[in-house]
């Protein structure tokens, strides 16, 4: 039997928004001292969150868990206007680690709200990004309504108030194919519906989904490194399975079941946008222990995007 090899997806792992969010927490701790409070997990990865806890970050779900006069960081997923207003009312020092591509969606929702349009948000109920985006809507600013649609079946039962004054936005980490199907169904039902000037699904989500499909065409098993609460990581594993390949989402190398690789010749390996390279390296080491002989990296879409840090943290680092 030929030796088992490993194919690495490209790109994989951290995106620009995740890099920025983690760096904001690290620099805030370095420059202001611990503890620094973070509302929600700054990114959805257990390893990253545990590392930041050891450095002095305290993760909370609501601002009432943050003491007066403390510093709080908003996670990469974004927050509602109500959360921002509460932080301002209490005089908390805030650093905003919201991904700029999520902020773009927030601006779209606020713009439609001011214009009095109805808005359909395509996303997963309960996800913090969706909660933050829904929370950009204010009835005080406009006469429209915001609706959440999770799947194509819900389009058939959707009943908007203003079908001729309607727009849509999306969560940034969705399956590209599923989202396009929902948008097509919405357009068929509401032909006058407006869309964003540019796709709301972020470049990193698109690139990693394209890369995992490239893997699936060449492998008989795909492992995705990412935490169970990571939306984009879950989508990667789903896509591989949808393309007919056995796939598992794992937090780290310890979760690999040796039975998975029995009889497999080509193992594909990728990582969600919130999973660090050190976890990928650990999985590679474990696969070598289990008999993997060679490792190669597929060609993929180059990524060079960098998002600026908050000005105060940049200045503090220089000084």
From Swiss-Prot:
Which residues bind isopentenyl diphosphate per the record?
44, 77, 127, 230-232, 274
Q: Name one Pfam family in it.
A: LYTB
The protein's annotated catalytic reaction(s) are: isopentenyl diphosphate + 2 oxidized [2Fe-2S]-[ferredoxin] + H2O = (2E)-4-hydroxy-3-methylbut-2-enyl diphosphate + 2 reduced [2Fe-2S]-[ferredoxin] + 2 H(+); dimethylallyl diphosphate + 2 oxidized [2Fe-2S]-[ferredoxin] + H2O = (2E)-4-hydroxy-3-methylbut-2-enyl diphosphate + 2 reduced [2Fe-2S]-[ferredoxin] + 2 H(+)
Q: Which residues bind (2E)-4-hydroxy-3-methylbut-2-enyl diphosphate?
A: 44, 77, 127, 172, 230-232, 274
Q: What is its EC number?
A: 1.17.7.4
Keyword check for Metal-binding: yes
Which GO BP terms, alphabetically?
dimethylallyl diphosphate biosynthetic process; isopentenyl diphosphate biosynthetic process, methylerythritol 4-phosphate pathway; terpenoid biosynthetic process
**What is the active site of this protein?**
129
Residues the record lists as binding [4Fe-4S] cluster: 15, 99, 202
Domain of life the protein comes from? Bacteria
| Cofactor(s) of this protein | [4Fe-4S] cluster
Q: Which InterPro entries match?
A: LytB/IspH (IPR003451)
**Keywords, sorted A to Z:** 4Fe-4S, Iron, Iron-sulfur, Isoprene biosynthesis, Metal-binding, Oxidoreductase
HAMAP family reported for this sequence: IspH
Describe the family membership recorded for this protein in Swiss-Prot or TrEMBL: Belongs to the IspH family.
Q: What does this protein do?
A: Catalyzes the conversion of 1-hydroxy-2-methyl-2-(E)-butenyl 4-diphosphate (HMBPP) into a mixture of isopentenyl diphosphate (IPP) and dimethylallyl diphosphate (DMAPP). Acts in the terminal step of the DOXP/MEP pathway for isoprenoid precursor biosynthesis.
Q: What is the protein name given in its UniProt record?
A: 4-hydroxy-3-methylbut-2-enyl diphosphate reductase
Name the source organism.
Xanthomonas euvesicatoria pv. vesicatoria (strain 85-10)
Show the taxonomic lineage.
Bacteria, Pseudomonadati, Pseudomonadota, Gammaproteobacteria, Lysobacterales
């Amino acid at each position: 039997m030929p030796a088992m090899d490993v194919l690495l997806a490209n790109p994989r792992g951290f995106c620009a928004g995740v890099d920025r969010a983690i760096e904001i927490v690290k620099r805030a701790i370095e420059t202001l001292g611990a503890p620094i409070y973070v509302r929600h997990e700054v990114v959805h990865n257990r390893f990253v969150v545990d590392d930041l806890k050891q450095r002095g970050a305290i993760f909370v779900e609501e601002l009432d868990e943050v003491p007066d006069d403390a510093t709080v960081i908003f996670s990469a997923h974004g927050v509602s206007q109500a959360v921002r207003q509460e932080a301002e009312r209490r005089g908390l020092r805030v650093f905003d680690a919201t991904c700029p591509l999520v902020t773009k969606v927030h601006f779209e929702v606020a713009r439609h709200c001011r214009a009095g349009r109805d808005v359909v948000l395509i996303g997963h109920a309960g996800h913090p990004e969706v909660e933050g985006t829904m929370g950009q809507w204010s009835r005080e600013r406009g006469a429209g309504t915001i609706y959440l649609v999770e799947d194509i079946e819900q389009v058939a039962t959707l009943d908007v108030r203003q079908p001729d004054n309607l727009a849509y936005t999306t969560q940034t980490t969705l399956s590209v194919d599923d989202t396009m199907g929902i948008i097509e169904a919405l357009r068929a039902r509401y032909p006058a519906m407006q869309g964003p000037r540019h796709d709301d699904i972020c470049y990193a989500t698109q690139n990693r989904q394209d890369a995992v499909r490239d893997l699936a065409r060449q492998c008989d098993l795909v492992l995705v490194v990412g935490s169970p609460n990571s939306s984009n990581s879950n989508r990667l594993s789903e896509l591989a399975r949808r393309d007919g390949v056995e796939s598992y989402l794992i937090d780290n190398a310890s979760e690999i079941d040796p039975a998975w690789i029995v009889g497999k010749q080509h193992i594909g390996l990728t990582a969600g946008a919130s999973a660090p390279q050190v976890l990928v390296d650990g999985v590679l080491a474990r696969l070598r222990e289990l008999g993997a002989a060679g490792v190669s990296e597929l060609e993929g879409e180059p990524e060079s995007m960098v998002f600026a840090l908050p000005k105060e943290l940049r200045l503090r680092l220089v000084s």
